[in-house]
């Protein structure tokens, strides 16, 4: 049957692709590798028995690379296996130290979004610091991507997270990436215009619907 992928379905719409950034990262990788795959959308509010049989803890995303292989969890591990099994075209980030660029943005973003007192707890400045670090990297290295003129795994990891950041902070907090961070803003435009991103992104309304319960709104 080839590659199969289990990813989150949209909140309230079990037949529509959901908002999980880690699931989108896997789909982006498969798309940019031009690999055929079958998608299973999993309603996390009503997980099917067959899914719980292969993932008792309900972990997503999951990938199976062949019919006689086991399902694999953890997006880092999955991306590594994809690169190992299907090395062309290469998505390896080089030099290796660039692979961690922007890695702290997701944590800072979630802390800021869920903060009850961001004006005083420093979560706003923590996020700004991480975005400024990304902006500095993009400004001082040839782009438009983190490691040069070609998209690599670090970009495919950052793209869904920056999409969540832009969508949720804009909707719930009327906040956006400062205009002074021109390199980050341009980088986001490039990422969001990728054909693979357009094909694998969740609609903004489903992303917002998924975050709302976590924010008590």
From Swiss-Prot:
Motif (Glutathione-binding) on chain: 20-25
Domain GST N-terminal positions: 10-85
Keyword Transferase belongs to the record: yes
One cellular component term from this protein's GO annotations in UniProt: cytosol
Coiled-coil annotated spans: none
Residue sites binding L-ascorbate per the record: 8, 19, 214
Keyword Cytoplasm belongs to the record: yes
Reaction catalysed by this enzyme: RX + glutathione = an S-substituted glutathione + a halide anion + H(+); L-dehydroascorbate + 2 glutathione = glutathione disulfide + L-ascorbate
BP GO annotations: ascorbate glutathione cycle; positive regulation of salicylic acid mediated signaling pathway
Family: Belongs to the GST superfamily. DHAR family.
Function: Exhibits glutathione-dependent thiol transferase and dehydroascorbate (DHA) reductase activities.
Protein name: Probable glutathione S-transferase DHAR4
Protein species of origin: Arabidopsis thaliana
Lineage of origin: Eukaryota, Viridiplantae, Streptophyta, Embryophyta, Tracheophyta
């Amino acid at each position: 049957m080839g590659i199969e992928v289990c990813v989150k379905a949209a909140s309230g719409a079990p037949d529509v692709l959901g908002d999980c950034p880690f699931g989108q990262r896997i789909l982006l990788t498969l798309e940019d590798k031009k690999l055929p795959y079958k998608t299973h959308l999993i309603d996390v509010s009503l997980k099917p028995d067959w899914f719980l049989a292969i993932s008792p803890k309900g972990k997503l995303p999951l990938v199976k690379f062949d019919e006689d292989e086991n399902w694999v969890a953890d997006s880092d591990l999955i991306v590594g296996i994809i690169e190992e099994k299907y090395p062309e075209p290469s998505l390896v980030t080089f030099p290796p130290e660039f692979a961690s660029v922007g890695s702290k943005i997701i944590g800072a973003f979630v802390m800021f979004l869920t903060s009850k007192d961001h004006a005083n707890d420093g979560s706003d400045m923590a996020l700004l610091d991480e975005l400024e670090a990304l902006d500095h990297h993009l400004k001082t290295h040839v782009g438009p991507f983190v490691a040069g003129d070609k998209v690599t795994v670090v970009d495919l990891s950052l793209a869904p997270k920056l999409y969540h950041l832009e969508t949720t902070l804009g909707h719930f907090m009327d906040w956006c990436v400062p205009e002074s961070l021109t390199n980050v803003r341009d980088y986001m435009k490039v990422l969001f215009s990728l054909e693979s991103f357009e094909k694998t992104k969740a609609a903004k309304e489903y992303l917002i619907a998924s975050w709302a319960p976590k924010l008590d709104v």
